[in-house]
C-alpha cells in the first residue's frame, strides 16, 4: 500500500521501498538476512525505529495503515510522534479508518506523555480539510529541508565530530 500512497501523491516513480525493507524496519529482530540488516534494520539497536498500525476488515483485509516514529522536542523536553505515512484505500475512505488510525497515535501520545503528533501533507492534498476538522493546524512558519543524493554524499565527506552519537 505504500506504493499506492506514492501513486496517489503523484510520485510513484520515486518509491523504491520493498516488502523486505519494510519488514526489516518494522521487525528488526526478525531481520535475518544480510540484505535486511544492511537496509538499516539494526542501525538503532534491537528495537524498531519504525512503528505501524493497520486498519483491517473483520475478515483481515488491510485497507489502511499509519507508519510512524518517535521524534523529540528539545524545547519541551519530551518525545512526540512523527507520522511518516497515513493511507486509506479509496474504497474505504469516509468510514472512519483514518480517524481511528490517528486516534490510536493520539492515544499513544496521551498514555506516554508525548506532547505532539505531527506530519507533513502535500499542499494540494484534499485530506487537509479532514486534518483541519480534527483540530490539526498547518505549521506555515516552518520550512522543511532535506539533504539527499549527491549532496548527502558530499556532506558526509566533511570532517565529523569525534565520539559516538
Walk through the language-model features, giving the residues of each:
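Conserved hydrophobic beta-strand within the GNAT/NAT acetyltransferase core sheet
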Residues: 83, 117-121
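Conserved GNAT-fold acetyl-CoA-binding loop/helix
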Residues: 2-40
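Conserved beta-strand in the GNAT
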Residues: 52-54, 61-70, 82, 87
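Conserved acyl-donor/pantetheine-binding loop and adjacent beta-alpha core of acyl/acetyltransferases
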Residues: 33, 74-81
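Glycine-rich phosphate-binding loop
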Residues: 92
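Conserved active-site alpha-helix within GNAT-family acetyltransferase domains
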Residues: 95, 99-103, 110-112, 123-141, ...
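Conserved N-terminal entry element of GNAT/NAT acetyltransferase domains
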Residues: 7, 152-165
Amino acid at each position: 500500500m505504500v506504493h499506492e500512497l506514492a501513486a496517489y501523491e503523484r510520485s510513484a516513480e520515486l518509491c523504491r521501498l520493498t516488502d523486505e525493507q519494510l519488514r526489516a524496519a518494522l521487525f528488526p529482530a526478525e531481520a535475518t538476512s544480510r540484505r535486511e540488516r544492511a537496509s538499516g534494520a539494526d542501525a538503532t539497536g534491537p528495537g524498531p525505529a519504525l512503528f505501524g498500525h493497520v486498519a483491517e476488515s473483520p475478515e483481515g483485509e488491510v485497507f489502511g495503515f499509519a507508519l510512524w516514529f518517535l521524534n523529540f522536542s528539545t524545547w519541551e523536553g519530551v518525545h512526540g510522534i512523527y507520522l511518516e505515512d497515513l493511507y486509506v484505500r479509496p474504497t474505504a475512505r469516509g468510514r472512519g479508518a483514518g480517524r481511528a488510525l490517528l486516534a490510536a497515535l493520539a492515544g499513544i501520545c496521551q498514555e506516554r506523555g508525548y506532547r505532539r503528533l505531527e506530519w507533513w501533507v502535500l499542499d494540494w492534498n484534499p485530506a487537509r480539510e479532514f486534518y483541519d476538522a480534527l483540530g490539526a493546524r498547518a505549521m506555515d512558519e516552518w520550512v522543511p529541508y532535506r539533504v539527499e543524493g549527491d549532496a548527502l554524499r558530499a556532506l558526509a565527506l566533511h570532517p565529523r565530530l569525534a565520539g559516538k552519537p
